[in-house]
């Protein structure tokens, strides 16, 4: 039952009318609940019913026209339209210059189909005058498969088809491989995620990517889907004995930590990420601790912590876009943070990569100079790194000892953040959390990559030209239709 309370603020004495000329006013004519998974309750929606007619109005009944055939639940001014009352309430009053609030939820039945099904009902306000006023209730119901606290102990493949909604941890045990097939989408509930002790292979393609996202299909505001919010699920965690993992053409977004990689044997490849996106995370987008990881043609963007955080290991990055425009907290960290504070950094090689964001310095490096006691380290951890043909928003390196680590690097000017957004990318809209990190024609990243080391195609499998661009996306001039002179 919807536990809500009605609001009343009116004259003690009101003159009620039965004239058909006096009508209620509604804040909306249609309550749209968007898409919900069948059998899963929706979030609550509401609207106001006001009386500006000059006289008090009394409803002989307020009822669901279809009863409960489509699963809508309604509370009118604190009165639940219960099945015991025939999904209606009698004698609802709206005094002159007063308003009441109506709350609506829906839980839909299974549709027995693959496509979303539209559901409609109407909430009927029958006035004492005999006039009936109606508000449409609209929702879409989508059948899904559900897994709860699932543990995978043998090789298993998740195929495209029905949406898969995950509750709790999805654990891949040591010795098992979880394969996610092209076109599959996994929807993770709050607190759910993938814990990989064995092996994970996301086999997306340019035409059929793998999508890993939260399970909220509704909107926070009319202009803002919940899917654009961060921290909706727990992301992917690769544990210390997990090796040979691969994520290709995978879109992972709106998690807490996107991908975490625990400390492991640096002599073995733990993870390869190619042609993928990790976006809008409330923790790190990608955090690597003393592991061997390769990232190429990928977008790591918008995280409260670092878009890419590295502590030790062997990490190679090529043709990636690391962009820190996280909108929800001004204390966001950097686009890139690499260090050897806890573990030796055997090598960190970053080629043909765009590193930028709101801050004037979006790259942080942690060189070990102290030991665990805080004293000067006699033999500090190895700290080997190199940047080649990159564009980096950081103060220009002039120290002679540091210069050999930066080859053909463009250090961005200290322009304001808005200029960085518009100069580099097609769209950065923090208000609507709407982003397009493909290059704008004004970006200095265009034609700056090394043809010898750049990837042959970009994040979206678009071929790079003979003068490839820095970052995950190759710039292509968008064709505009020529005006028809006869029109």
What are these regions (language model features)?
Residues 5-9:
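C-terminal motif of bacterial Sec signal peptides marking the signal peptidase cleavage site
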Residues 11-17, 24-35, 40-42, 46, ...:
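Beta-strand/loop edge motif enriched in small/polar residues
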Residues 42-44, 54-59:
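Short acidic/proline- and small/hydrophobic-mixed sequence motifs that coincide with surface turns
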Residues 49-53:
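Asparagine-centered strand-capping/turn motif at beta-strand->loop junctions
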Residues 65-87:
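Short, solvent-exposed loop/linker segments at beta-strand-coil boundaries, enriched for Pro/Gly
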Residues 460-464:
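Cytochrome P450 C-terminal beta-domain/meander region
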Residues 465-472:
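Carboxylate-dense, calcium-coordinating segments in secreted/extracellular and ER-lumen proteins
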